[in-house]
Design a protein with these regions (language model features):
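A short amphipathic helical element positioned immediately N-terminal to and/or at the very start
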Residues: 1-8, 109
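Transmembrane helix-loop-helix hairpins at lipid-water interfaces of multipass membrane proteins
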Residues: 7, 11-69, 73, 146-151, ...
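An intracellular "coupling" helix at the cytosolic face of ABC transporter transmembrane type-1 domains
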Residues: 8-10, 95-99, 115-124, 128, ...
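Hydrophobic alpha-helical transmembrane segments of ABC transporter permease domains
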Residues: 18, 26, 48, 66, ...
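Membrane-embedded alpha-helical segments of multi-pass transporters/permeases
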Residues: 28-32, 68, 72, 138, ...
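Short intracellular "coupling" helices and adjacent cytoplasmic loop segments at the cytosolic face
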Residues: 43, 79, 87-111, 115-117, ...
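Helix-loop-helix
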Residues: 45-48, 58, 144-161, 228-302, ...
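ABC-type nucleotide-binding domain
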Residues: 322-564
Length: 564
């Protein structure tokens, strides 16, 4: 997959390889020219020194320029590949259902799209900057070193075997450690994210010490993994250098006697030592890159898990159509992923177009679950849900989204403007449509008090608005598309009694033909509904008007009595 991404930048990659070739040629020629300069100096051929020296400087300049261009090209390729991977991953995540998101965990996905892709980006960068250069430099330096002093070939082989052997052992040991490191990084990110989002709860219940202890436990474990990896490499790198410098010392000691009989051999020794140093450099860099490559391989596997994941739900690839606003549940049973007990059990009911229907029940009765099944955020394991007489699994996503709109209990706004947030409900919503939706949601008053009205900025998560204002904008977003079925999942809970009453009056007046489903904790929110559904422990145990249920349904009557 990574190779396919790099192919997108094939011309930059080819140019980078050309620059790599020039860099290697420069590195291999410089010791040879240095050898010739020393030879000319020792033999008194001073005229040759200038011409050879000019070539030496020219070759060095070519290598320097090629190196600079290669850095630019490598950065371009690495940034492009990481951007493409990040976009592919985000695009795939957009196809995930609620169940898929819960399986991966939101914090986990954030780490994969940031830290893991950064690891891959770094390795792609180093691949074009260094990795392609190493085998060419190693082979070229080995051949030229042996050619310069053939009798010392075994010194190079011994050094290479020792260093590569240790590197192979360390790579085998480090792989599991890097995987553990990534897992701990996910956990520490999840804890930090959870605490930052829930800072009010932490402060309210004086949980700072407990949360800090929880964070510290994972942080210490992460530190332990990092220290282990650091200690391991603190042993490996000095050992590599020790072997390398030992090889240099051994080479000089072995040829020391040759200098006395033939002083011109000094140039050969200098050239040999330079080539030996380049061999040491390549091996040390392989060890260094091994660390990064190990991390990147694990990161690549984690990105592939996202890209290769099969969404738990898919929509039919068929043309959009118009559906009427009737709704029916037929023997629906639903269990959340990872749960054993069903949240909804054999639920059946029918709602006619234009009806206002309330859904009540104790906490945990399955009210919000029922609401989330209608826009197909989850699929039931048994039974069928039909809108306009059609199973919602047999219609396109576009059809379902324009037919059903849901206002969630927790108002979530995105950074941008008020208009940007309302247009999430309908992408091409006009100012008139937004005004209408804001009026129904009782949001017009505070929006028009703002200098830029609908173009006023919304900060991340809507932190510059009160809870009630965010909830009213969330309601307006649900209304703006004028859906056939509108669901309120206890979404008026943040409103005061007056605002809630005004919203309900506006809904009755302006959305008369819309099928409205109100999930409510308070009986007063659904007292005027055409029909009320009563849920208890996942089962539908009653349905009827307010008066019928007060008279005939014990659970409803109990809720009513506690709220009088």
């Amino acid at each position: 997959m990574l190779i396919q991404k790099i192919k997108t930048y094939k011309w930059q990659a080819l140019a980078s390889l050309l620059m790599t070739g020039l860099m290697v040629a420069s590195s291999l020629l410089q010791p040879r020219y240095l050898q010739e300069v020393l030879g000319a100096l020792l033999t008194g051929k001073y005229e040759a020194i200038y011409s050879i020296g000019a070539w030496l400087i020219g070759v060095a300049v070519v290598g320097l320029v090629a190196g600079g261009l290669n850095v630019v090209l490598a950065a371009y390729i690495a940034q492009g590949v990481s951007s493409d991977l990040r976009e592919d991953a985000f695009r795939k995540i957009q196809t995930f259902s609620y169940a898929d998101i819960e399986q991966f965990n939101a914090g986990n996905l954030v780490v994969r799209m940031t830290n893991d892709i950064n690891q891959i980006q770094n390795v792609v960068m180093m691949t074009f900057q260094i990795l392609f250069r190493l085998p060419l430099l190693f082979i070229g330096s080995f051949i030229l070193a042996v050619q310069t002093l053939p009798s010392l070939w075994w010194v190079i082989v011994l050094m290479v075997v020792l260093i590569f052997g240790l590197t192979a052992v360390m790579m085998g040991m480090m792989g599991p450690r890097f995987a553990k490191f990534q897992t701990l990084l996910e956990r520490i990110n999840a804890i930090a994210k959870e605490n930052l989002r829930g800072v009010r709860v932490v402060k309210s219940f004086v949980q700072e010490k407990e949360q800090f202890a929880k964070f510290t436990e994972v942080s210490d474990e992460l530190l332990g993994q990092n220290l282990y990896i650091g200690y391991a490499f603190s042993v490996v790198e000095p050992f590599m250098m020790l072997v390398g410098y030992g090889a240099v010392f051994l080479s000089i000691w072995l040829v020391a006697g040759m200098v006395q009989s033939d002083p011109s051999v000094v140039g050969s020794i200098a050239s040999f030592v330079n080539y030996l140093s380049q061999i040491i450099f390549t091996i040390v860099m392989v060890g260094f890159l091994g660390n990064s490559v190990s991390r990147a391989m694990i990161s690549m596997r984690r990105i592939r898990e996202i890209l290769d994941a099969e969404p738990a739900m898919t929509f039919k690839d068929i043309p959009d159509e118009e559906l009427v606003g009737s709704l029916s549940f037929e023997n629906v049973t639903f269990t959340y992923p990872m749960d054993k007990e069903p949240m909804l059990k054999d639920v059946s009911f029918t709602i006619e177009p234009g009806q206002m229907v309330g859904v009540v029940g104790a906490t945990g009765a399955g009210k919000s679950t029922l609401a989330q099944l209608i826009p197909r955020l989850f699929d039931p394991q048994e039974g069928a849900i039909k809108i306009g007489g059609k199973d919602i699994r047999e219609v396109s996503e576009g059809t379902l989204r324009k037919t059903v709109s849901i206002v969630l209990q927790r108002a979530i706004l995105f950074s941008g403007t008020i208009a940007d947030n309302l247009r999430q409900g309908k992408g091409n919503a006009t100012l008139f449509e937004m005004e209408r939706a804001a009026n129904i949601a009782q949001a017009s008053e505070f929006i028009h008090r703002m200098e830029k009205t609908f173009e006023s900025p919304v900060e991340e998560r809507g932190t510059n608005f009160s809870g009630g204002q965010k909830q009213r904008m969330s309601i307006a977003r649900g209304i703006v598309s004028n859906p056939r079925i509108l669901i309120f999942d206890d979404s008026t809970s943040a409103l005061d009694a007056k605002s809630e009453r005004l919203v309900q009056e506006a809904l009755n007046k302006d959305l008369k033909g819309t099928t409205t489903i109100i999930i409510a904790q308070k009986i007063s929110s659904v007292v005027h509904a055409d029909k009320i559904l009563v849920l208890n422990q996942g089962r539908l145990i009653g349905q009827g008007t307010y008066a019928d249920l007060v008279a005939n349904n014990a659970v409803y009557r109990e809720i009513y009595e506690t709220q009088k």
